[in-house]
Amino acid sequence: MSISHFTALIWLGFLAVVALIALGYVLVQRSRHRQMLRFSNMEVLEKVAPSRPSPLRHAPIALMLVGLVFLTIAAAGPTSVQKVPRNRATVVLVMDVSLSMEATDVPPSRLEVAQQAGKEFVDGLTQGINLGFVTFAGTASVMQSPTTNREAVKAAIDNIKLAERTATGEGILTALQSIETLATVLGGAETPPPARIVLMSDGKQTVPDDKDVDNPRHAFTAARLAKSKGIPVSTISFGTEWGSVEIPDQDGQGGSQRVKVPVDNESLREIAKLSGGEFYTASSLEELTAVYDTLEEQIGYETTRGDASRPWLLLGMLVVAAGIVTGLLYRQRLP
């Protein structure tokens, strides 16, 4: 029963009263003992009284004092930090669908593993969250607008089609637009629901050029825009340094060449930093699933202060009742 705060702290002052009662009981017991020794016929007393009084004679008052302590804590209105499912939030999963996702360094392929882990992420999110799905290669597409229909999102993940080039910035900008559209449709609330973008990619941006950081469509520019809107972008760098794919030659002769497609941790780390999100890496299904599990905890739940007085109230009542019962069972009187 953890406590993080009290709503009526003044009631804890009653603990001083409990302490005075305990002190008074001790003083009364000592006074009675002295009076008994002073005025009693010791020969008679030794014959009729037990040689050593049972310590159980103090149990009733001890239990009732402890019960009063618990009841006092309950009266002070204790609260605790509680984790509760979010019932108002928007998340957009943004997935890289460039040709590099065909790489088999994460067996059976980056794409298949990303699809499997992505669908598990969808299933794991709490039902109150509106979840959307965006893909990007040379351009970005809204595969599923934010919705609470999890089956629709999983169907969209199953329908991924790979394409050339990588426009990471377009993916972020499209996700932002999707979030804003939902907020407009919902309306009514004084503040828009909290939102988060989860971006999974395996390579460096190629459209626009990765070095053209001032381009309004650049991923870094999009990340700064997300930051200004209060929408963090959590990024996942997925794959290994030794990934490669077969790329058809452009000469039309039917040939191909193997091209290395290593992951680009630095760019994705910078996107997360600029937007206020968090950066993760994954090079296997297990690692990607673990990342999504972490994000589910962060996104799907929020911490709030909740009333924690009931356990203390019940415990206090039980202990006081135990004190009364003990007093009835073990009360001793001299004959």
UniProtKB/Swiss-Prot annotation:
Please report the stretch or stretches of sequence annotated as the VWFA domain.
90-295
Gene3D superfamilies in the record, alphabetically? von Willebrand factor, type A domain
Keyword set, alphabetical order:
Cell membrane, Membrane, Transmembrane, Transmembrane helix
Key word Zinc present: no
**Ranges annotated as spanning the membrane:** 8-28, 61-81, 310-330
How is this protein situated with respect to the membrane?
Answer: Multi-pass membrane protein
One GO CC annotation, please?
plasma membrane
Q: What is its main location?
A: membrane
- What's one Pfam family the UniProt record gives for this protein? VWA_2
Superkingdom, according to UniProt?
Answer: Bacteria
Q: Which InterPro entries does the protein's record reference?
A: Aerotolerance_reg_N (IPR024163), UPF0353 (IPR022933), UPF0353/GerABKA_families (IPR050768), VWF_A (IPR002035), vWFA_dom_sf (IPR036465)
Q: Where in the cell is it found?
A: Cell membrane
For this protein, the record's PROSITE patterns field holds: VWFA
Family from the record: Belongs to the UPF0353 family.
Question: What HAMAP family does the database record attribute to this sequence?
Answer: UPF0353
Q: What is this protein called?
A: UPF0353 protein NFA_34780
Which lineage?
Bacteria, Bacillati, Actinomycetota, Actinomycetes, Mycobacteriales
